[in-house]
């Protein structure tokens, strides 16, 4: 979950930071292995956080204690996932199959004057350590700029923007292609009377 300052600046409802923590808790509870009940905060010093609390209220309050209003270093997040796997000798098949980057997409660059994206850089580092970079869902919960963390047609990446139950269902059911989204919208009851 992006805990950088820009996640608090938006006047939208719900606030991007609230969405980020909610989704982080949801996905963390469904993780397995070394990442079970963990999520990563990210700004300049990302942390792998084990979620604590008896109920959703306690879990959210606990997660809020890790909010750091600083810059957003997405590369440090990829490095933390990789170093955790290496440290725990996680088998490749026990790695998370998908990473959800819940953010407003205002990331720092991974390297100055670099010709590679943060994603390409991470993919190479994972491969150097015997792992495949998990599929990545960049979920923009507060679009203010036209920033994109990957180039068009990048394999293994899904870009999602917005915050509503339909988008949540599509992401969790793994129906995130533009074509599937279009069909989902067009097949709604409100368009049933339209004939071609």
Predicted ranges, named:
Residues 1-196:
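Acidic, glycine-rich A-domain
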